[in-house]
Amino acid sequence: MKFTKMHGAGNDYIYIDCFKEKIDCPEELAIRLSDRHKGIGSDGLVLIMPSDKCSFRMRMFNSDGSEAQMCGNAIRCVGKYVYDNGYTRKLNITIETLAGVKQLELFPTNDKIRKVKVNMGKPILLAKDIPVIWEKEKLIYETIDFSSEQWILTAVSMGNPHVVIFVEKVSRLDVKRIGKEIEHHPMFPEKINVDFVEILSLYHAKMRVWERGSGETQACGTGACAALVASVLNGKLNRKATISLLGGDLELEWDEKTEHVFMTGDASLVFIGEF
């Protein structure tokens, strides 16, 4: 089986071209390939597939084998793959995901895609739709008791569920301990991604992320979008800002007119191989 390893802001996935390869059990394959000691090593597996209603379709699986709705960093790399490998010459394409249809704008340099802008759609703020078990309509800057401590949470879905927590210094956090506890809290019936955000200015923030099913990763595109939305709602960031993650920077904009969130970032090839 041939594969391509790519990353967006350090968020690395194994990509399988399902125009050429047949995958019978992607859940099991994701676990095997993602193992950083016994496999290839990645945050998960992405299948690039034909679509009946869009330019292309993607399915993605976390490193624990669970299927995820969307990944902002992964979808940029899908855009890179289909252009670089000659499946399209268009610079504006659509990709079908479990979180809906996403629109991509591709930016070539020397006939290779280096940067991609994604229309991530409107954020979901209603607690029942995220989903979050909560007595109010929305969960915005609410103090929640956990077994070890209290945290102030804002819940946002960008096709997959996130809670955003504002902290003084992301570098000082025990992200694994805190993230794991919040991810599995019963108020989140589908578990939750946890985004820790340190505000640097109205136009810049740092972030670390604990992803459900994968643990801490170098970056999370939907998480960065959720962080921007939560920051705007709480008066901490401008609608257009940079989010710096462990693996690199993402440029975000929450358009006031359409309410859509746009994310721009890198898409990079790591290597190609057979497994």
Swiss-Prot record:
One Pfam family of this chain: DAP_epimerase
SUPFAM superfamilies registered for this protein in UniProt:
Diaminopimelate epimerase-like (SSF54506)
Q: What is its main location?
A: cytoplasm
Q: How does it assemble?
A: Homodimer.
Gene Ontology CC terms: cytosol
Gene3D superfamilies linked: Diaminopimelate Epimerase, Chain A, domain 1
Family matches, as NCBIfam families: DapF
* KW Isomerase (keyword) present: yes
Q: Which gene encodes it?
A: dapF
Q: Under what name is this protein listed?
A: Diaminopimelate epimerase
- The record's EC number reads 5.1.1.7
The UniProt function text for this chain reads: Catalyzes the stereoinversion of LL-2,6-diaminopimelate (L,L-DAP) to meso-diaminopimelate (meso-DAP), a precursor of L-lysine and an essential component of the bacterial peptidoglycan.
Q: Where in the cell is it found?
A: Cytoplasm
Q: What biological-process GO terms show up in the record? A: lysine biosynthetic process via diaminopimelate
**Catalytic reaction equation(s):** (2S,6S)-2,6-diaminopimelate = meso-2,6-diaminopimelate
Q: Which UniProt keywords apply?
A: Amino-acid biosynthesis, Cytoplasm, Isomerase, Lysine biosynthesis
Q: Superkingdom of this entry's organism?
A: Bacteria
InterPro entries in the cross-refs: DAP_epimerase_AS, DAP_epimerase_DapF
Family per UniProt? Belongs to the diaminopimelate epimerase family.
Q: Which PANTHER family does the record cross-reference, listed alphabetically?
A: DIAMINOPIMELATE EPIMERASE, DIAMINOPIMELATE EPIMERASE, CHLOROPLASTIC
| Feature type site, description Could be important to modulate the pK values of the two catalytic cysteine residues | 162, 211
Q: Where is the active site?
A: 71 (proton donor), 220 (proton acceptor)
Metabolic or biological pathway: Amino-acid biosynthesis; L-lysine biosynthesis via DAP pathway; DL-2,6-diaminopimelate from LL-2,6-diaminopimelate: step 1/1
Molecular function (GO) terms for this protein are: diaminopimelate epimerase activity
Q: What residues bind substrate, as annotated?
A: 11, 62, 72-73, 160, 193, 211-212, 221-222
